């Protein structure tokens, strides 16, 4: 059966390639660790050559009786390898275990390194010796029996080998009553020396098929690199080796070697099936190598080793149902314990192996290498305490494999118990390594449905290194109880430089890290010594996806646990850097509604310190992840450890909070809400320091920087549920991101946060919640449709600031929502800064729900201390934002009424684009107890500063109960400056229907400055209102009120370098009552028609102007003026003093002892009245003159006022109602009134004021009525001036030339149709179709441009339309036909805003006669033209008029056709020369016209007639081929208008009673015309045509084009 021989060979079956394979897989020699990327054969070659230098000589002699090779011999001696060819396997089914020699022909036992040669498939099977011994509980004593047998008979072995074979066969048989236990068996055998020699060569306890026992006295050393052990080497295509159903009590049931085992070149494969050991492995050795084999099948093996009883469950080298590789003698794993599966060509199946009470369901080793294998590998349904498939006390290296590797259904069975705690390093459903687990440069790797009852559903390792994969790596549906649904690592997880897709899908863990956990298990709260990242996902070009992983899914907890969650990743520091492939976190869950703890959440990522996402060029997506929800149950009291005292508990809460935040937290004071008692009973508060949420990420620090790919956070859910309750100090929320310190989103390309939600009533930050948030230097940023239950529908910084700065493109917050404040951005304890952004900034349709019983504010932004919007380059939009109580767009302040009154300021300055607040609103009306506190349709703040902006600042259509535009809190100030654009308040409406620009609350808020630079305006179309009319800012009693104003209009610069303000402050509508003493220092204070401005005093300084319009009122009132401040009087030596007493200046108390001087509250030196504002009402009533009203009992400071009448729009003299007839015109009215409620009346004391009137001069540029102004006079407090009209000067825009020019345009339209008829339908080519009938259709276009000629206005005319016609030859060479057409177009004035829209209908009849070379043709075209005229006169209004014009054109032409001799060369270009002459007559009638609207005119009817004689020639080229005939023609003509009657119309301007004759533009009578045409007959039934006509006259260009199709019958 076995031919045994010993040979010396240079190359034994244990070939050089095996060693290379081992080295390349990373096996260590003399502490050198070589990897595939670092392969250096020098280390091996040097050692190998030292041991085999002299083996090159072939030795064929057989050594008999010599000693085995001594490993301790000198390196220069030759190494001997015993070669044993195997010819057949063995079966133990027929063996009698009671026979002492039952292993004689079954087991191969050797004491020297042996190479077994195999050339066919051999199987050892069906032997069970487990009953020979029960496994020992001590790992080393289990080998004592074998060692004893070997030592006792060592001296006899040489004799046994040289003994005659016949003697061997004559040995006594072992008695049938031989004890079954090995101890008694050895004792019995020792009594009989004859059989002891045989038994010593066979061991029924292990290595039933192959047993290698090293007999050397020298143990394996760390320096010994020579090979010792068993080599199974296949040769030939049929070589294979199998072990089936071999079961033994000790390690290595089938194969045992106390040195190394090598399986190589087994083409038909290697198999271990249903083998079992009660200790370690079916095959056990110091190192095991499987290389260059075919299919490897390792199934249904088991080990009965009980590490729990031995207290060795953490020894990952023990167990292994199939292979166990460990060194018993040397603790340094570099000297042994390596299990290598390298370079195999067949499939590897490792299935249903079991190590129920030990580690490594299939393999247990010191380190494991799986490298360079070419076919698929499957580890399926294996189980063990740790490492369901493989366990390693050091590293696991899986690299360079070409085909798929799958770990599925493997289980780690170890669970929490008396000796296993939460922090023990155990688990690994498929793989467990106490060192580094490397997956490198593999094709496909899949870990599916592996489970662990502790850590690492698929993998448990100190470090996991996944890199350089070229295809998919997938972890799917793995589960763990404690940490890492897929991977759990102590030190680091590295996913780097992968080219293929990495997928973590539906992995689940009860506690931490749904897909990956990496961190310290002893105390996850503590920072690790190494501050670097411990989860690194870097440099990957393939996609990485975390899909539907779950963490912290317990429903009932027995104790509280912090730092739980991380649906995909859990780590101390997490880094996603420099990935070019897309990274996606989708549908991961990091928590449940039942979890109890203080730092819980992170739907995708939970980090105890820092998360960094940087430098990624691929997209990074977080979608549909769900963070921790608040607990709804108490910790089960009957299962909980004793609760600490209140003091210790409080101290623990504070320490825990500080640990996670690295600083103090100051959660905002919120509005106190009553929680129903039933809700408190059902869902009690668990902790007052809960930190929960982060639908995508929960960490202490979050940095998202320098990513060039798109970043998208979409549909993530963080925070609590609707029914949850939390304590006052809870920090809950962050629909996408939750950080207890800062979130930095900086220098990225495109960032989008959409549909992220944290919906509990105490949750904040629908997208981002942090202590501080920085969003800066990104290209574009968008927050859309995010929502929260408390603050920050999109972004919330609970303690400090939100900074949105230096972004390069658009920043958008739209459709975000929340309940309390800041649907876009919230900083309830800090500030908001929006600064230095280069693109547009938009806050649109953000919504704060609010309620009638709860304060809320800031539809777009809420901040406690300040909002600063500064130095942004693009437009800034706040549109359609809404809130409950305060600030539809922006609220700066506190929602807690009792909170301190620190200054709150909104600053908008230095911005380059336009700023718009439009359609923002508050929804809740103020209650009676808070009458004016709710409001601010656009803005609610204490201090408002809008200055130095380059664009317009507009407030349009905002709504609120008060302060529809802006509301200012008590004690606040307003400073507005129109710098580079206007500031406008228009259409801002309070709930009561009143228009309100700014509302100031309390009795101390005020406007400090309203200024505009030159040519800029601050325009109040809406009124300014105050809650209290107490006069603000009265000076000390020794200072005159007018000398210390509290309101400045157009402030003067303090020095020459400062900005002058010479623009206009305009109040355009409503009544603005400002209880402040004001001064206008420069520029203009203007009141538009019917506007009213009430002031407590007004001082006008030199160089400024006050412009009043008709119906406007400037009123000075004296209500609640404190008399402790003196008023200026005529007698400066006398002062009115009444300390602390409020007086009514209209009822002064006379002093009988001395005269009381008249006080002065208005110091006005000049008034300007806008003449153009005296526009009559609809019924023709003239408006009232502007009024100046002062308090009764006071006077104007000066008895002289300069009154200037101006006409700023140059239309003042177009006021027909005012100036068309002689009348006395009141220009201004001076009155007095008592208090704020008194009726203004004329006061005789004001009639003595001297008013110098300056009237507007009439210049050549002045149009309208002319006349003479008379001297002014005072009548009943009114200044009256007389007007005597002398004439009217017509503005050229009213000349009406466009109406008359339309007649020429109609002529061009009629002629265009006539020219089509002459060019296509009455030509010789058509006449040659005898007795045919044609139906045709065409499209036409006309363009005409006439410049201004002299004083006459030119025009531009455009027209398009279509025509349909039919013609026939009744007799030969005689054609008649007709057509219908419709045109649409317009005619516009060259100089003015006047346009006439045209829609015309035309009909035509035509005929032609062909007589030899003569062609006579004629046409008659009639038109009915509808006209709609619109004239825009700007401020004067618009007039319209409509009429129908009628006209016709008749023309005839005579052509002579000269055919060019075809023999001439020119005939190739011109076949026919056609001279012609035409006669043409046109007549167009204009009916009488009456306009509607403003400045209406009437036009008398008139007519336009013209007779023209065109003559010239045409050059034709005819071409025919088959049924196709084509004629191309070029025509040139000169036109002379022999008669013309131009239109002249008498036009009347009704309101001015002025008439004049108007003429159309004088078109020159001479013209040149050219035409290009093509007529093609494609066959006897179809023809097409095209033509372009061009006409040139001096100052006029016209051209038309036509094209059509003709069907021939």
Curated annotation (Swiss-Prot):
Residues 1328-1609 form the Autotransporter domain. Its main location: secreted. Residues 149-175, 651-672 have a biased composition (Basic and acidic residues). Residues 132-145 have a biased composition (Polar residues). InterPro entries: Autotransporte_beta, Autotransporte_beta_dom_sf, Polymorphic_membr_middle, POMP_repeat. Residues 1-30 form the signal peptide. It is found in: Secreted, Cell wall; Cell outer membrane. Pfam families: Autotransporter (PF03797), Chlam_PMP (PF02415), ChlamPMP_M (PF07548). GO terms for cellular component: cell outer membrane; extracellular region. The keyword Membrane applies. Residues 132-183, 640-677 are annotated as: Disordered. Keywords: Cell outer membrane, Cell wall, Membrane, Secreted, Signal, Transmembrane, Transmembrane beta strand. It is a peripheral membrane protein. Belongs to the PMP outer membrane protein family. NCBIfam families: POMP_repeat. This is Probable outer membrane protein pmp21. It comes from Chlamydia pneumoniae (Chlamydophila pneumoniae).
């Amino acid at each position: 059966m076995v031919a045994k021989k010993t040979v010396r060979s240079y190359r034994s079956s244990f070939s050089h390639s095996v060693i290379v394979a081992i080295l390349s897989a990373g096996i260590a020699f003399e502490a050198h660790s070589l990897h595939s990327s670092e392969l250096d054969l020098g280390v091996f070659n040097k050692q190998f050559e030292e041991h085999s230098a002299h083996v090159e000589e072939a030795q064929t002699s057989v050594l008999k009786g010599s000693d085995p090779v001594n490993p301790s011999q000198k390196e220069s001696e030759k190494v001997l390898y015993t070669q044993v060819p195997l010819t057949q396997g063995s079966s133990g089914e027929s063996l009698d275990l009671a026979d002492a020699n039952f292993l004689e022909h079954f087991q191969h036992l050797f004491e020297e390194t042996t190479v077994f040669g195999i050339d066919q498939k051999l199987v050892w099977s069906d032997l069970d010796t487990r009953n020979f011994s029960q496994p020992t509980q001590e790992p080393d004593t289990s080998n004592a029996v074998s060692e004893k047998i070997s030592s006792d008979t060592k001296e006899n072995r040489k004799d046994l080998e040289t003994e005659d074979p016949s003697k061997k066969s004559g040995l006594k048989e072992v008695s049938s009553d031989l004890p079954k236990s090995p101890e008694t068996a050895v004792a019995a055998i020792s009594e009989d020396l004859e059989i002891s020699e045989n038994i010593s060569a066979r061991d029924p306890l292990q290595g039933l098929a192959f047993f290698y026992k090293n007999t050397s006295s020298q143990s394996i050393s760390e320096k010994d690199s020579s090979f010792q052990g068993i080599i199974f080497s296949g040769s030939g295509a049929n070589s294979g080796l199998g072990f089936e159903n071999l079961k033994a009590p000790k390690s290595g049931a089938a194969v045992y070697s106390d040195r190394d085992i090598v399986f190589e070149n087994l083409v038909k494969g290697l198999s271990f099936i249903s083998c079992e050991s009660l200790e370690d492995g079916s095959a056990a050795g110091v190192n095991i190598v499987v290389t260059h084999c075919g299919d490897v099948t390792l199934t249904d093996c088991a080990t009965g080793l009980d590490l729990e009883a031995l207290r060795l469950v953490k020894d990952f080298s023990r167990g292994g149902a199939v292979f166990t590789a460990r060194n018993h003698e040397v603790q340094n794993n570099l000297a042994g314990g390596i299990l290598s599966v390298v370079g195999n060509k067949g499939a590897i199946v490792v299935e249903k192996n079991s190590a129920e009470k030990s580690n490594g369901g299939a393999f247990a080793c010191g380190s494991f290498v799986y490298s360079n294998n070419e076919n698929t590998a499957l580890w399926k349904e294996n189980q063990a305490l740790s490492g369901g498939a493989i366990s390693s006390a050091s590293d696991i290296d899986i690299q360079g494999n070409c085909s798929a590797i799958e770990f599925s259904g493997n289980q780690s069975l170890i669970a929490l118990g008396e000796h296993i705690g939460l922090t023990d390093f155990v688990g690994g459903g498929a793989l467990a390594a106490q060192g580094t687990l490397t997956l490198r440069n593999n094709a496909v790797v899949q870990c599916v449905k592996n489970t662990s009852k502790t850590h690492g559903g698929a993998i448990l390792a100190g470090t996991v290194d996944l890199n350089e994969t070229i295809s998919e790596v997938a972890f799917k549906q793995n589960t763990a109880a404690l940490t890492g649904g897929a991977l759990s690592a102590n030190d680091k997880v590295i996913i780097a430089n992968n080219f293929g897709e990495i997928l973590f899908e539906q992995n689940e863990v009860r506690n931490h890290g749904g897909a990956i956990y990496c961190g310290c298990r002893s105390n996850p709260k503590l920072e690790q010594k190494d501050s670097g990242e411990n989860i690194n996902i870097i440099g990957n070009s393939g996609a990485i996806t975390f899909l539907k992983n779950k963490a912290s899914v317990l429903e009932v907890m027995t104790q509280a646990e912090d730092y739980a969650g991380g649906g995909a990743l859990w780590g101390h520091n997490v880094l996603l850097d420099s990935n070019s492939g897309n990274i996606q976190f989708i549908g991961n869950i990091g928590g449940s509604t039942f979890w109890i703890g203080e730092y819980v959440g992170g739907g995708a990522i939970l980090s105890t310190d820092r998360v960094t996402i940087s430098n990624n060029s691929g997209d990074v997506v977080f979608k549909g992840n769900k963070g921790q929800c608040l607990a709804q149950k108490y910790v089960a009291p009957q299962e909980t450890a004793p609760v600490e005292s209140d003091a210790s508990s409080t101290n623990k809460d504070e320490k825990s909070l500080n640990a996670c935040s690295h600083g103090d937290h100051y959660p905002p004071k919120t509005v106190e809400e009553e929680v129903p008692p039933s809700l408190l009973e059902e869902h009690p508060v668990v902790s007052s320091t809960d930190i929960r949420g982060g639908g995508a990420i929960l960490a202490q620090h979050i940095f998202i920087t320098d990513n060039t790919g798109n970043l998208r956070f979409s549909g993530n859910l963080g925070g609590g549920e609707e029914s949850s309750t939390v304590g006052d100090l809870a920090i809950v929320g962050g629909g996408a991101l939750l950080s207890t310190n800062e979130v930095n989103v900086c220098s990225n390309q495109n960032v989008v946060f959409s549909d992220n939600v944290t919906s509990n009533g105490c949750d904040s930050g629908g997208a981002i919640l942090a202590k501080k948030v920085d969003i800066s230097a990104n290209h574009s940023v968008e927050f859309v449709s995010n929502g929260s239950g408390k603050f920050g529908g999109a972004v919330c910084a609970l303690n400090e600031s939100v900074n949105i700065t230096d972004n390069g493109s658009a920043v958008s917050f739209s459709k975000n929502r929340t309940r309390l404040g800041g649907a876009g951005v919230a900083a309830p304890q800090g500030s908001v800064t929006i600064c230095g952004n280069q693109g547009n900034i938009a806050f649109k349709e953000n919504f704060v729900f609010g309620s009638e019983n709860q304060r809320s504010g800031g539809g777009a932004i809420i901040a406690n201390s300040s909002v600063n919007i500064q130095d942004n380059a693009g437009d800034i939009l706040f549109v359609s934002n809404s809130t409950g109580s305060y600030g539809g767009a922006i609220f700066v302040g506190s929602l807690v009424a009792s909170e301190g009154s620190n200054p709150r300021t909104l600053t908008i300055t230095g911005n380059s684009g336009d700023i718009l607040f439009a359609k923002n609103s508050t929804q809740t009306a103020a209650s009676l107890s808070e009458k004016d506190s709710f409001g601010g349709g656009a803005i609610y703040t204490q201090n408002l500063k809008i200055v130095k902006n380059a664009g317009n600042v507009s407030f349009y259509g905002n709504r609120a109960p008060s302060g529809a535009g802006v509301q200012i809190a008590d004690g606040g100030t307003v400073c507005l400056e129109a710098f580079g654009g206007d500031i406008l308040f228009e259409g801002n409406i309070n709930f009561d229907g009143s228009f309100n620009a700014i509302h100031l609350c309390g009795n101390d808020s005020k406007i400090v400055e309203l200024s505009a630079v030159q040519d800029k305006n601050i325009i109040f179309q809406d009124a300014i209102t105050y809650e209290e009319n107490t006069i603000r800012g009265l000076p000390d009693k020794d200072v005159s009120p007018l000398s210390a104003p509290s309101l400045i209009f157009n402030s003067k610069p303090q020095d020459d370098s400062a900005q002058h303000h010479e623009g206009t402050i305009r109040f355009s509508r409503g009544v603005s009552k400002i209880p402040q003493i004001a001064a206008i220092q420069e520029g203009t204070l203007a009141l538009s028609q019917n506007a009213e401005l009430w002031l407590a005093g007004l001082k006008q300084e030199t160089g400024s102007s006050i412009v009043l319009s008709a119906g406007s009122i400037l009123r000075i009132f004296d209500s609640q003026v404190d008399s402790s401040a003196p008023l200026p009087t005529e007698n400066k030596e006398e002062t009115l003093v009444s300390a602390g007493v409020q007086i009514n200046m209209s009822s002064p108390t006379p002093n009988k002892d001395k005269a009381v001087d008249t006080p002065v509250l208005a110091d006005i030196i000049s008034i300007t009245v806008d003449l153009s504002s005296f526009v009559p009402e609809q019924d023709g009533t003239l408006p009232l003159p502007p009024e100046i009203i002062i308090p009764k009992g006071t006077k104007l400071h000066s008895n002289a006022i300069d009154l200037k009448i101006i006409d700023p729009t140059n239309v003042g003299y177009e006021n027909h109602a005012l100036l068309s007839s002689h009348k006395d015109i009141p220009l201004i009215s001076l009155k007095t009134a008592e208090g704020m409620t008194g009726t203004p009346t004329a006061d005789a004391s004001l009639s003595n004021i001297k008013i110098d009137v300056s009237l507007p001069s009439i210049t050549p540029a002045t149009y309208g009525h002319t006349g003479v102004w008379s001297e002014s006079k005072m009548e009943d407090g009114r200044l009256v001036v007389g007007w005597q009209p002398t004439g009217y000067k017509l503005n050229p825009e009213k000349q009406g030339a466009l109406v008359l020019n339309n007649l020429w345009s109609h002529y061009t339209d009629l002629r265009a149709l006539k020219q089509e008829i002459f060019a296509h339908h009455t030509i010789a080519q058509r006449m040659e179709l005898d007795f045919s009938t044609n139906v045709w259709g065409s499209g036409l276009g006309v363009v005409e441009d006439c410049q201004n000629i002299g004083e006459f206005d030119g025009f531009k005319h455009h027209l398009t339309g279509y025509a349909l016609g039919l013609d026939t030859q009744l007799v030969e060479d005689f054609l008649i036909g007709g057509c219908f057409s419709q045109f649409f177009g317009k005619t516009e004035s060259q100089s003015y805003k006047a346009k006439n829209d045209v829609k015309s209908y035309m009909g035509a009849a035509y005929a032609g006669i062909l007589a030899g070379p003569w062609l006579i043709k004629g046409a008659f075209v009639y038109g009915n033209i509808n006209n709609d005229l619109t004239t825009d006169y700007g401020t004067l209004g618009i007039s319209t008029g409509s009429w129908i014009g009628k006209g016709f054109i008749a023309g005839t032409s005579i052509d002579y056709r000269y055919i060019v001799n075809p023999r001439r060369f020119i005939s190739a270009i011109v076949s026919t020369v056609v001279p012609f002459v035409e006669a043409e007559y046109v007549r167009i009638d204009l009916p009488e016209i009456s306009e509607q609207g403003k400045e209406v005119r009437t036009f008398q009817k008139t007519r336009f007639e013209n007779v023209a004689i065109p003559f010239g020639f045409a050059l034709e080229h005819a071409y025919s081929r088959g049924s196709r005939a084509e004629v191309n023609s070029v025509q040139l003509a000169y036109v002379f208008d022999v008669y013309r009657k131009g239109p002249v119309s008498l036009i009347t301007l009704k309101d001015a009673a002025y008439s004049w004759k108007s003429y159309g533009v004088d078109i020159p009578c001479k013209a040149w015309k050219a035409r290009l045409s093509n007529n093609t007959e494609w066959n006897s039934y179809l023809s097409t045509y095209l033509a372009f006509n061009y006409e040139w006259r001096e100052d006029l260009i016209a051209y038309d084009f036509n094209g059509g199709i003709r069907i021939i019958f």
